[in-house]
Amino acid sequence: MTIQRRTLFATAAISAAGMTLTGCAAQAAKAEAAAAAFVPPTAEKPLLLCFNENPLGMSPAAKKAVAAAAEKGSRYPFARVEVLRKAVAQYMGGKTDNILLTHGSAEAIRASIESYKTADVQVVAPELTYSDGTDTADKNGMKVTRVAMGKDWSIDIAAMKKAVSSWKGSSVVYFVNPNNPTSTIVNSTELLDWIASRPARTVFVVDEAYAEFVADPTFKSAKTLVDAGFENVIVLRTFSKIFAMAGMRLGFAYAVPATIARVKKHVAYDIMMSVPAIEAALAEFADPAFLTYSREQNAEARTILTAALDKLGIAYLPSQTNFVFMNLKAPLKPFADRMKAEAIWVGRPFPPALTWCRVSLGTPAETAYFVKKLFEFREKGWV
């Protein structure tokens, strides 16, 4: 199947309606250039709008660093791990003993929750969120308390507080902020004040995988409490999202030294990171312009998609990440199957939001192509 460049460009331009004339002209030029290089997806090489990855790939500097790392592959990475730990600490504004390096944030989630496993512990999490936290609890035989969502799939902090205060044992509270799959943030003041109140026998695991994408000025990272010395909070970050290193498997936990020491007992060796991953991460840190460019491209793609959804009358939640959560008002599976037939993969089901679809943002050209398919689906009565 082919798509005319003119058609793709027109879709992007229409979707960007509502921007200022100057902004629209600038975006039009970028969209036209991107459309010129765009290759439509195929069954063998589908458009992956399902995993919330950075569609730009690693920065050129990181790719070169990975290739050069082959020369170091025969040696253990002890020294370079410490260089990376120092770089991560500097990035977070902390010290090296605040950092626990992990194989992706998945290991950090698991280790953080397992380190607080007791006979009377419960893991408290919103009903609609990334499932690694509750999955870890289930695998460890820990009680899981899933708290119903508030209006518009918001996280009901008051209800979560009640779940903790009414429990006689210990609690691990798992937050994803910005939340996945909703792409929304919680009220920072409300969350941080709760953590700072130090509820008895309670630790907070705050997964900030998408923090680098947030544009809302009211957002505050829970790292501020770590910096203030609070021992009851662990902040998790990953290199899988804006850093475009999902396949490299690198993440970290950020907490006060005593908390880091506790969690560290539940990872194999935080000095045994992959050499290519270490070198890629260091290269990314040395190239802040790439992160800025990634944010800009993500924002442009988001504008293309949300403008189209507005035009189509499809509701969606305000996005603070690299994906959008939209309401199909119909079961997800038929839509996902039809998109897959077009070589486009969208997000999996997220109960209980069974009529909602999480769409990862591709490049502006990829997103414009998805938008074109949305309009075609509307013509067929499918959305």
Identify what each model region corresponds to.
Residues R338-A341, F350-V383:
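PLP-dependent enzyme catalytic core of the Aspartate aminotransferase-like
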Residues C24-R75, G169:
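N-terminal "arm"/small-domain region of PLP-dependent enzymes with the aminotransferase-like
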Residues E82-Q122, N140:
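Phosphate-binding glycine-rich loop
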Residues N232-L317:
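PLP-dependent aminotransferase class I/II
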Residues S115-F175:
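PLP-dependent aminotransferase-like
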Residues M1-T22:
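N-terminal secretory signal peptides and thylakoid transit peptides that target proteins
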Residues M149-K151, N298-A299, L309-E342, L361:
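Conserved PLP-binding catalytic core of the aspartate aminotransferase-like
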Residues K151-P217:
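Active-site phosphate-binding strand-loop segment of PLP-dependent enzymes
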